[in-house]
A protein has these predicted regions:
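Bacterial N-terminal signal peptides
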Residues: 4-13
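Conserved alpha/beta-hydrolase
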Residues: 86-101
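Glycine-rich "HGGG/HGxG" loop immediately N-terminal to the catalytic nucleophile
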Residues: 98-110
Length: 195
């Protein structure tokens, strides 16, 4: 009886932590609001609006020209797992969706921001084809602002923003042009691969 009572007391004293979402399915997605009517999709291991004392680092992975954020999310999950860092790392892969008819035929949800695949596209901070007030950099700015909230992620020590191929082009340009780097209060590291 004493052992079960002691065990019950210990269970009450142990904080409950969120479990990372580890599937590249809708259960691991979240909509990021961009203005009043616009939204953009991310894959993520933890919700951006629920307090999480456990998260110490963030890894934001930008997909390539194929706009396959789900595959990049899977790869980043595997890397975090192999590094033994899955539980205290929030992994995010934003989706720059497009269905502008030039080889890009993503299915968009209601109010989902549509980015161009050609010309002044999402990889260069281009203006959305569905909302002329938004650029692809606005989307990343909002993700980073949410990560830097101390009331949600009080123990976040650093953010890594990385991209491969067209995602690498995006990260290179974003590093030079973003408006939030010096305002976040969290160190931000940029890693570019095969731009």
């Amino acid at each position: 009886m004493r052992i079960s009572l002691l065990f019950s007391v210990l269970l009450i004293c142990v904080p409950a932590y969120a479990v990372p979402c580890t599937k590249a399915t809708t259960e691991c997605t979240e909509w990021v609001k961009l203005g009043q009517q616009a939204q953009a999709l991310i894959y993520r291991t933890y919700a951006l609006d629920q307090k999480n004392d456990r998260v110490a680092r963030a890894l934001v992975v930008v997909h390539g020209q194929g706009r396959d954020a789900d595959n990049y999310f899977r790869t980043a999950l595997a890397a975090a797992f192999l590094a033994g860092a899955l539980d205290d790392t929030i992994v995010i892969s934003p989706r720059f969706a497009s269905n502008n008819g030039t080889g890009c035929r993503d299915t968009l949800a209601a109010n989902e921001v549509n980015w161009s695949c050609a010309g002044d596209s999402w990889r260069s901070g281009g203006i959305s084809t569905s909302n002329k007030e938004l650029t692809s950099y606005d989307f990343m700015d909002e993700i980073l602002r949410k990560l830097a909230r101390k009331d949600i992620f009080p123990n976040l020590r650093g953010i890594v923003l990385t991209g491969h191929s067209a995602g690498g082009q995006y990260v290179t340009r974003y590093e030079m042009a973003n408006q939030v780097n010096d305002k976040l209060g969290v160190p931000l590291t940029y890693v570019v691969s095969n731009p």
